[in-house]
Amino acid sequence: MIEILGLSYFVAQVGNLSDWRRYAEDVLGMPVSSAPQGGLYVKMDERPFRMLIVEGDERRYLASGWELASAAAFGHALQVLEARAVTYVLGSAEEIEQRGVQALAVVIDPSGNRHELCWGHRSDCQPFVSPQGVPRFVTGDMGLGHTVLPAPNFDETLAFARDVLGFRLSDIFNFRPSPDAPAVRIHFLHCANARHHSLAFAEYPVASGCVHAMVEVDSMTEVGRAHDRMLAQGTPLSATLGQHLNDRMTSFYMQTPSGFDLEYGFGGLQLDWTAHSVLEFTRVSIWGHDFSVGRQQ
């Protein structure tokens, strides 16, 4: 079985890199730098980047980068893919250089989401210094945060994530837009770290290629300060401040320049998976998180 350590990075596309530069620095509080082949690195911790932004005609999320522990773990992952008859493509020299890793293998899940398996990230030993004074983001061995991806082919995609990529179920949400409507499934998955979920799948298509990605800060004060910066910069709000029921994250949602949402939160659960029981929860949040504000814009 493949053992993924966490969400190492994501790749997104935008028409003008300066839009992401302003958003990262002025709203998220993350410094940026130039990436090879003309992209933009967005830095969250001691690594050179956690978000790779490239320029293109379409605003969208392009890929999720999943970290493996070693060359041996990467080789084992390729063996698993071959044994399962899963098509993969090894990353080009340009892709490996741009992502700053030792090796890369690309797989596409049954809903069309691109997953990049990688190992051996490059480090420049430069500290994280926020342009907005954010002390730190909660990353480390839990990865950059989480990503929620569209899965219109839900059963096949969930099976792929669990049986091929090695993710395990954290919790289940069956969303009903109205009491008589059929349930829309959203399943939350974890990997080899304590974060409640590093990946989730939602049973519907999303034009931008991602429902949302999440980043976590280490205090509620920093969530509030980011909320103020969002308002000051005129960034579209997607959901009001609230606290989720499943992972207890207190957060708000806003739109990125690539068209998908970003959740900015504090206080997400870190779990001992040997003692965890899967929960089906019946509401998104304990309080707040009014998503109708995003639909009104």
Over which residues does each language-model region extend?
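Conserved donor-binding loop and adjoining core beta-sheet/short helix segment
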Residues: S34-A69, S92-E94
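Short, charged/polar, Gly/Pro-enriched secondary-structure boundary elements
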Residues: R47-L52, G112-H115, R195-L199, F260-D261
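N-terminal beta-strand motif that seeds the catalytic metal site of vicinal oxygen chelate
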Residues: M1-S18, Y61-W66, R122-E156, R168-S170, ...
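Core segments of cupin and vicinal oxygen chelate
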Residues: I2-F49, L149-H196
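Vicinal oxygen chelate
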Residues: G6-G15, G56-P152, V184-H190, G234-Q297, ...
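Short, structured motif recognition centered on aromatic/hydrophobic residues
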Residues: I4-F10, A24, M30, V42, ...
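Conserved active-site tyrosine of GNAT-family acetyltransferases
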Residues: W20-E25, L81, G112, T157-R162, ...
